[in-house]
Amino acid sequence: MAATKREPLRPISSNAGTVERRARGGAAAAAAAKEKEKENEVPTEIGRGKDGGEKKPPVVVAVVVPPAPPLKPSSLQVRMKAEEEKEREEEEEGSSPAVALVAGLQVRMGPRGRELLLPPPPPPPPLPLPTSSSYEAWDLSDNEAAPASSWATLPNRALLCRPLPLDVGRCTCIIAKETLAAAAAGARGVALYSLYTNEGQGRQDRKLAVARHRRRRGRSEFVVAQNLDGIFCTSDKNFLGTLSSNLVGSRYRIWGQGNRVDEIKSQSKRLLGVVAFAPTVTTLTGSFRSMRAWIPKNQSIHLKNSNSAQIQHISGLPKDWQEKKIKADQLCSRSPFYNNMTKRYELDFRERAGRMGYKVQPSVKNFQMTLEEKGRQTILQLGRIGKSKYIMDFRYPLTGYQALCICLASIDSKLCCTL
């Protein structure tokens, strides 16, 4: 019996089985990868295999994924859709929302029971155009004329020599210095002041009077007439009178024309007014002017629409008018107020600020006069609106000539006033 050859024994190790298994697993993975590469290889000859037979192309299987089932709408969406369809049907049928009474008011109810706003009311019909002259002058366009003033029908002589009727109210005039016009008329070097009516927008202003200023022996003198002919010839029918002052300019006297026949016989004139200026009033905050005027009282009151004759002045102020003040009307200047913004004294012209489009400028020559001390109604006022241009408002019992002379006395330069 033959002896069997034995292999030498290997040392037993705990990692021997693990190493062997890893080796076998690696070989199997390599073989599988190699087979996969062979499957993915593109054959160089289509239709021929290794054995020479025809090779079929690979079959491509299209996998169709079924669409996802639609989502089921929620109960809220179903209800909203039903309400929209219901509203659409109501609109097609022409049904209008219901109207309910809530707290005594009509409220339109929608299809869902909601309150709807009522439609706005229709616009009111346009107002008819006014047929009278009661509307204001500033409501007119540039091409329309302002309504005629209540004194527009009075002639020039009546405005100058007769008191303004009570029912006329206030008369507005413009005083302008016209040196160039005087030079053109042959009176070179003589200052002329012209008085114009302010008829309003779109109307022709009337020239009422002209005043010539000159100095005689240091005193101011104004010769007033309706035109230039009366200025240079006092016997002309257009001559109205003169305004003269004392040496320092503290007192002015208004002389009227009077009856020309009586003047030739007695060589006397009628005193139609006196204007007195007090020395400049000086206070801790500044200074301002103060003035007074006296005019004859009228015999009666005249109305524009009455059939009675025009009233006339009495024979002027009597010689003892200062002792008999009852025969004269006294006009007092209104005290100005101190403006903290401009730091000076000013008068309140807001009453006439929007009328006729003129803006009164601050000036020491501006004034407002009333019939009583601290009276409320303004009888005469003067306001500066430009260089050597003033606006004048006067009312009963003044005449246009008296109002012009009082304003010229304030415009004239004087020694008694430091302003």
Curated annotation (Swiss-Prot):
A Pfam family annotated for this UniProt entry: Tub
Encoding gene (name): TULP4
UniProt-listed InterPro entries: Tubby-like_C, Tubby_C
Coiled-coil residues: none
Protein name in UniProt: Tubby-like protein 4
Provenance organism: Oryza sativa subsp. japonica
Chain intervals with Basic and acidic residues compositional bias: 33-57
Region (Disordered): 1-96
Gene3D superfamilies to which the protein is assigned, alphabetical: Tubby Protein, Chain A
Domain of life (superkingdom): Eukaryota
SUPFAM superfamilies: Tubby C-terminal domain-like
Family from the record: Belongs to the TUB family.
